[in-house]
Structures are given as C-alpha cells and as structure tokens.
C-alpha cells in the first residue's frame, strides 16, 4: 500500500499549478501550493502514508463532520427538526435558498447548516472550542492538535456573509445563541490544524459502525454512522458532490484548506491534502488522487 500511495502521488503531481490556493481567507493564501500528502487507515488501525502526510493544515469545512457528530450525540433524531439532510444544489453560502426555505438549512455541510449545528453545540458545551479540540484529539490519538488563532481571526474579520445567514435564521426562530459567539466557535473549529494521518485516524469510527478505534467506545450508533456517511456522499463536496460520487464513489468531506477525507465503510478511511483548489473549492489534485486510488483498488459504495 505504501508503494501504491507514492505511485499515485507521483502520477498526479504534474497537475500542480492548475488550481489556486484559497485566497479569500488571507491567512490561507500564504500556504505553499506544492505540498501533497495522503494517508490511509484500515478499520483495524493499520496506517499507510506518502508525501506530506504529517504536515498540518487548516481543516476548514472538514470540521463540520465533527460538529455534526457532537450535535447528533446530544440531540439525536430531534436535531433534524432544525435542518435537513438533502443536497442543496446551491453555493455553500447561499442566502437566497435560506430565505426561501424560511431559515431551515438544507443540510449540515453548507455554511448555514453548519452554523445551526454550532448553535446546538453552543447550548450544550460551556466551552465549545475546547470541547471540539479535545474531541478531535481523542479521535485522532494526537494530543497536540490546536486551532490556528491567526486563521480563525482572519475568518472572523471576513464574517459578513456567515453573520448574515445566522441573523436571518435568528429572524426565523432557528438560531438561539449569541450570533457573534457562535461565529467565533465556528471559525475556531474551521481553523483546527490537523494532518492527513490525524484525519484518517479521526474518521475511523465512520468505517467501524461508529466505534472509535482509539478508545473502543461508541461515538455513534451504526444507524447514525450510516446517516452521516450518507450525508457526506450526497453533500460533502458542496455542488461537486455528484462529480465526486461519479469519479471516486465514496462518502467524502472537503475543506478549502485543500483536504479531502473519504470513507470506505467497514474497511478504510483516506485523507489526501493538496492546497490548490478547483473552481468548486475542492482540492484539484486531491480529487485526482482519490479517483486513482479508488480505481486501482476497486473502492466504491456504488
């Protein structure tokens, strides 16, 4: 597997330069664009890696999966009274759809849905930022994970559209806590710095019917695990989820930091990272690497 991963990285590396590093978040614009890493973790905990798999990066929207899992653990099925689990078909930060649907986001992975999830967790935890940090430290087995305060502050200073969504949902009665406090938590989560190895391990419970490989406890029930994987498959890559399903065929979640995590239920979790993004905001080389890996090994849920 190590040799195969290195072979795939060598195969996709010529694509460097065809994408663009996220520049609408100033603190992310400085990330060197030529970095590329991949890690695969089996359901039994065996790890394989290649390239810059241990270089930390800003996980951004990948954090929405961890937030969702925390909220499901707190609210269970009642969580879905406040948001849906359908694909959006609109840009991840659309205000038009949110107003048309009276403040109820389509799913937890568009920004409005992620803010509702953070609002739920704000009501549950006294210190949501520390609760999230400790949660991902436990899932990954890495006690050194931190949030990049420079990135979080940079995102907070450019919060206008996210704030507009939160206040709009508040106007419809679907936002219960202080908007600015929830935004602070949201950006803190997005600014968590993890590497491919951390994320491949942290997502392991989604390949094991909800059982955490690190501690052996149930993070989710088997039914809840299936639900999270299903939402990742339909909505995990914004309006490119269909293309990802077509090319890769696995549940996945991306972030504008250049990371993509994919789950092979019952078998493996994979994380690939390359900071250059395509027009849809997903890692251009990451998509190509996961497609190649899926084709070589025959991984697909379809």
From Swiss-Prot:
EC number: 3.5.1.2
Reactions it catalyzes: L-glutamine + H2O = L-glutamate + NH4(+)
Keywords: Hydrolase
Domain of life: Bacteria
Top EC class for this record: hydrolase
Endpoints of the signal sequence: none
Gene3D superfamilies for the chain: DD-peptidase/beta-lactamase superfamily
Descriptive protein name: Glutaminase
GO molecular function: glutaminase activity
Family: Belongs to the glutaminase family.
Subunit organization: Homotetramer.
Lineage start: Bacteria, Pseudomonadati, Pseudomonadota, Gammaproteobacteria, Pseudomonadales
Hydrolase is among the record's keywords: yes
Biological processes per GO annotation: glutamate biosynthetic process; glutamine catabolic process
Pfam families: Glutaminase (PF04960)
Binding site for substrate: 61, 111, 155, 162, 186, 238, 256
UniProt source species: Stutzerimonas stutzeri (strain A1501) (Pseudomonas stutzeri)
């Amino acid at each position: 597997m190590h040799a195969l991963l290195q072979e795939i990285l060598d195969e996709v590396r010529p694509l460097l330069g065809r994408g663009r590093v996220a520049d609408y978040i100033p603190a992310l614009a400085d990330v060197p664009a030529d970095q590329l890493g991949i890690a695969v973790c089996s359901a039994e905990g065996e790890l394989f890696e290649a390239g810059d798999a241990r270089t930390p990066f800003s996980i951004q929207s990948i954090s929405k999966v961890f937030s969702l899992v925390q909220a499901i653990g707190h609210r269970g099925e009642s969580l879905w009274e406040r948001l849906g689990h359908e694909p959006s078909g609109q840009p991840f930060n659309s205000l038009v759809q949110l107003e048309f649907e009276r403040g109820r986001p389509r799913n937890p992975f568009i920004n409005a849905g992620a803010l509702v999830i953070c609002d739920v967790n704000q009501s549950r935890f006294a210190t949501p930022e520390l609760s999230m940090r400790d949660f991902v430290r436990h899932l990954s087995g890495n006690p050194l994970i931190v949030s990049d305060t420079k990135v979080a502050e940079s995102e907070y200073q450019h919060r206008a559209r996210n704030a507009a969504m939160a206040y709009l949902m508040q106007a419809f009665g679907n936002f219960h806590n202080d908007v600015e406090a929830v935004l602070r938590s949201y950006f803190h989560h997005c600014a968590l710095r993890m590497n491919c190895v951390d994320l491949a391990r942290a997502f392991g419970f989604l390949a094991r019917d909800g059982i955490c490989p690190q501690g052996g406890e149930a993070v989710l029930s088997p039914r809840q695990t299936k639900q999270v994987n299903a939402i990742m498959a339909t909505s995990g890559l914004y309006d490119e989820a269909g293309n990802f399903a077509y090319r890769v065929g696995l549940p996945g979640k991306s972030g504008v930091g250049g990371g993509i995590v994919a789950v092979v239920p019952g078998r493996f979790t994979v994380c690939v990272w390359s900071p250059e993004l395509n027009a849809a905001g997903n890692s251009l080389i990451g998509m190509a690497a996961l497609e190649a890996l899926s084709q070589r090994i025959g991984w697909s849920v379809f």
